[in-house]
Amino acid sequence: MQLAVVEFARNICQMKDAHTTEIVKHCKYPVIDTLPEQKTLIREKKYGGTMRLGEYPCLIKKGSRSHLAYLKSRQGKQNKKGDILVQERHRHRYELNNEFRKDLEDKGLIMSGINPERDLVEIIEIPRHPFFIATQFHPEFKSKPLKPHPLFREFIRAALANKKRIKSE
């Protein structure tokens, strides 16, 4: 998800100098960055408390492609608004910088999965694309050979549908 956000910021939002601070520490548009409370720890080289590790909640917005994937697989709990709450596994240090969230959304990037505890973006989508979903978490950590993660299953469905569409053209 992180480099997808960088590319979207550069090419769609016209933020030519957008980057992740993991690669370019002092870039003009740090669309991917560490959380403010992590910065001091990183400066002091105390990396132990700077990673987001383990399982965290993700609220998936009703009407999104991700929502449809989880709905089809009957995973998660639906709230009164129809959003689905799931638990997903993480292992990362950098996040989408919420200072740029509105700019990205205004240009069409959908933030379809949000951590409800910290308001962190977990899933992004580009609706005009046949299948463009990127995640901050690791869906492969909850996938098995005979029970693939809902997003993997939807990706395969979309690929097959696109293949049929191309053959018929």
Question: Predicted segment positions?
Answer:
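Amide-donor transfer/coupling interface in amidating biosynthetic enzymes
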Residues: 10-169
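Catalytic nucleophile loop
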Residues: 1-9
